[in-house]
Amino acid sequence: MTIEQANQYFAALPDGFASTEQLRTAFTATVQKVQFVGVAGTAGKTVTARLLAAILHAQGIHAGLYHAGCRPLSERICIDDAPVDEGLLALTADALSAAEALPQDAAELAAAANCFGAAGCTLAVVELPDAGLAEALPGMPVCAVTSVGPDGVSRSVERLAALAAGVMRKESICVTAPEQPKSVLSELIVAAGKCGCELVVPDPEDITFLEAEKFASKVDYGGYTVPLAFLGRHAAGSAAMAVELSLALCRKGFDITDDAILEGLAAVENRSSIRVISQRPLIILDACRTPQQAAALLRVLNMAKVRHMSAIIGLVEEEGAEAFFSALETGLTPEEQKKDKSTMPGMSENPFDKVYLVTPAGGDDEMTARLTEKAKYHF
């Protein structure tokens, strides 16, 4: 295969679930020599994985990085902070296509792991859209569960937390996000206790914002001073997780210095799904899709003192829309709104003067009308 054919092969694979045995069978022998850090959760997986990989690179550890997502796979597998060798990935795709077909998530993870094994990586940081795939990975001294919240598939946050906890294993150290909902944290504590995994929760009180500009800030976490690309506790929480993951790896025998942690955190440019496309006029693109992510976006804009903006919101379904609009209006998640009785729909001060709703072309006109009415209730 060419690299274009390899990317097309993985992109065309169907969704679905693979058994642990199926995935293990797809691994080459060299994968057994790689230690993995699995990253599960609803939001923040990409940034947390990227930050940790940057720290490993700064330390000089021969490490791989795999991001889940929809970009071509060749752009989502990195080794030593550089895209994977195209010839290596093409050969890996050839081998996988000749064996038993796997669903897309499992096939991508197998391809990434096989590339890391062939390259002789010591460590590899991998995003896990399905935490159940973690069981097939040979060694995982440290793992992570990022922020857990509604995913638009009508599953409770407790159920989502239990699924994300599938990344844990006996005698591993799992770092989770600060300020998880109580119900989520309870599920993670129970899961960690059952499998004999140590759970580390960064203390939100250890996060201190030292200075702030319009779209940048400097944060101290436990003595580590970190420049962040954006304001907001979500970015600071991801940095705190990366620090704790590095310290956990130190406890597992890896040598990671404080200087490497600081250098790695400072080196990463894209730390969030929020992207500033233009400063003048100010144009921001955010891939938020959950109430938690909508609240995080609003908090960033409020901290930056941005006003008189227009928002263009694209929705493909009605499920979860009410909670999303409410969080984008108030900056509060559904759990926080239950505690704060002072918030009334349509009465909160926020950055948006106008809000435009966009739904897929050729979609359900009645659904669009219902979504519009929901939006009018808040803006």
Where on the chain are the PLM-derived regions?
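Hydrophobic alpha-helical packing residues
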Residues: 52-57, 116, 249, 375
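Short functional linear segments
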Residues: 1-41, 48, 54, 58-59
